[in-house]
Amino acid sequence: MAEQLDMGRLNLNDSQHAPQNGFNGERSAYIPPHLRGRPQGGPPPMNAAPPMMNGGGGVGGSAWGPAPGGPSPAPPARFDGPPPGQMNGGGNWANANAQAFTPRGRDGPQGGGGWGGAAPGKFDPSAYGKPGGGGGGSARGSGDGQWKDGKHVPGPSNPRVERELFGVPNDPSKQQTGINFEKYDDIPVEASGQGVPEPVTRFTNPPLDDHLLSNIELSGYKVPTPVQKYSIPIVMGGRDLMACAQTGSGKTGGFLFPILAQAFQNGPSPPPTAQAGGYGRQRKAYPTSLILAPTRELVSQIFDEARKFAYRSWVRPCVVYGGADIGSQLRQIERGCDLLVATPGRLVDLIERGRISLASIKYLVLDEADRMLDMGFEPQIRRIVEGEDMPPTAGRQTLMFSATFPRDIQMLARDFLKEYIFLSVGRVGSTSENITQKIEYVEDADKRSVLLDILHTHGAGLSLIFVETKRMADSLSDFLINQGFPATSIHGDRTQREREKALEMFRSGRCPILVATAVAARGLDIPNVTHVVNYDLPTDIDDYVHRIGRTGRAGNTGIATAFFNRGNRGVVRDLLDLLKEANQEVPSFLESIAREGSGFGGGGGRGGRGGGRGRGNAATRDVRRMGGGGGAGGFGGGGWGGAPQGGYGGGYGGAPAGGYAPPSGGAYGGGGGGGGGGGYGGGYGNPSGPGGNSWW
């Protein structure tokens, strides 16, 4: 064994650890490989100054001593940092010219000092509640803009962020202006109210801000849409607004443009005086603008638009919605939240947690307001608007946007809006003439085979197929996949990650067929959808309007096909009216079925609200200017001017002859002319009637 190891030739004095120069006859301490070969020397005296730490990074030098072969450094000053003017430091790990380590010396503009950042400044407890959570004046926002000395200072351009937000020319994932976009100028616009300002015709300063104009140009917008032409001067003039416009006509820009323009001009609001301070990030956010929308997809879409137009500004948009990790949303809010886009349920949750205050709100936007009420969000909305610390109606601007505003929603708006201007663009509650509507008579058993024929015929572009149930969405997408069509589905039971993945694959064209329930029907801006198929017709004509509005957006043309059979006769009258309004071909079987059903009345609109949401003029006109007039064959009617004979009754000026005035404590009951009986007697009843309960 000894011969194998050749122990005889081992000599401990040849070792790196052997004593050098007879140093007391003792072995030296272990020397790491990267320190071997340095000039030898004894340890410094105990009272010597600490060694310089100019870190020759890597193998050639130590992070804790002078560089190899370098001159002996002068003793550093005490722990007060480098001399002024020598603040080129950074970390002490890779720069051979770095200055001595300082725990917290004089931090210079180039990042000297151990923390390597901006000057910490003095502790200011009042700064920790401000938007952005203090931070000693550091840049913040969607880009890197700042509000400094009473002026908006935009941040530098970032090509990577620009590509992410605005895409590249002819990017298929971004909506391009369609061939009929210029025809929007021919759409009639009706604005009612006191002191309606003149519309604008171009994006200019004034009224908009120069920085916003540059972001609008980056987005590829050339001229304002009709709703934007009116909403910009109305909101910039400090007025409340209720706006109806065709889907895809620029409603989102209609409220984002004026809100952001005023934010860029006026700066952030001062924080409330009494705040609970915090260390590091702020504990509670004080947004100045709140945008409420009904679905996760819609708030995400609005947030993406807000990021575009707030690019390089001091405004930091945030989005919160249910079904996603609340921790990441809280961290986003803590970094600063000036413009908040939220679903009502998640916002109430964050308010209860004490993480959001509405005390600084200047602008409240309700997008797809009728849909939010239909989905049961009214208690949360009323709590947010009336039950928390939001300024009263007179202390904020309130904007309501939707493609339809039925009568009861307009009446509800009087609680939230003050002296508002009602804006109706085009045939609101109707559909775009850019959409070619086809109604096919198809029995349920034949729907799948007819759908395959349609997909074979209209194979190009993106196809969006609407069904009524979650089970049908998965079943139909599986069927299409088995038939060789790339399809995916989106509905309420899929996780947020799955829904976002499905939408991304659909938008990009990797999966050009999307089967969806109503969750994807309202407000989603999915560009370049060429064909919408209503595999299952909805029971509500407004839902049909919003579904087919996913195509024909921004002036593009599209096709909408609906499968109709006798099981859908409840919407036949409304469907007929809709086709005639949009100058579409009316199939003969629709008129035949409509005549069959005329005995039991149609046009009841959303029966769940007493039928008052029929397709009468109330869905498109300012209810303040109306004196009644029911929906076709429905309950409708009422209003401030009184109900027609036998109509629903229940107005704000008392129920005249024939209108339904509830008896004492009345709830449900008669009075319903026009077929179908009365709706909610006392529910929407006459507040001045004997014992009638006002719904609001």
Swiss-Prot record:
It catalyses: ATP + H2O = ADP + phosphate + H(+). GO terms for cellular component: cytoplasm; nucleus. Residues 232-423 form the Helicase ATP-binding domain. The keyword Disulfide bond does not apply. It is found in: Cytoplasm. A motif (DEAD box) lies at residues 367-370. Residues 434-594 form the Helicase C-terminal domain. Disulfide bonds: none annotated. GO terms for molecular function: ATP binding; ATP hydrolysis activity; mRNA binding; RNA helicase activity; translation initiation factor activity. ATP binds at A245, Q246, T247, G248, S249, G250, K251, T252. Residues 54-63, 108-119, 130-144, 598-615, 666-696 have a biased composition (Gly residues). InterPro entries: DEAD/DEAH_box_helicase_dom (IPR011545), Helicase_ATP-bd (IPR014001), Helicase_C-like (IPR001650), P-loop_NTPase (IPR027417), RNA-helicase_DEAD-box_CS (IPR000629), RNA_helicase_DEAD_Q_motif (IPR014014). Its main location: cytoplasm. Residues 1-178, 597-622, 659-696 are annotated as: Disordered. Residues 12-23 have a biased composition (Polar residues). The Q motif is unique to and characteristic of the DEAD box family of RNA helicases and controls ATP binding and hydrolysis. PANTHER family: ATP-DEPENDENT RNA HELICASE DBP3. ATP-binding RNA helicase involved in translation initiation. Remodels RNA in response to ADP and ATP concentrations by facilitating disruption, but also formation of RNA duplexes. Belongs to the DEAD box helicase family. DDX3/DED1 subfamily. This is ATP-dependent RNA helicase DED1. The gene is DED1.
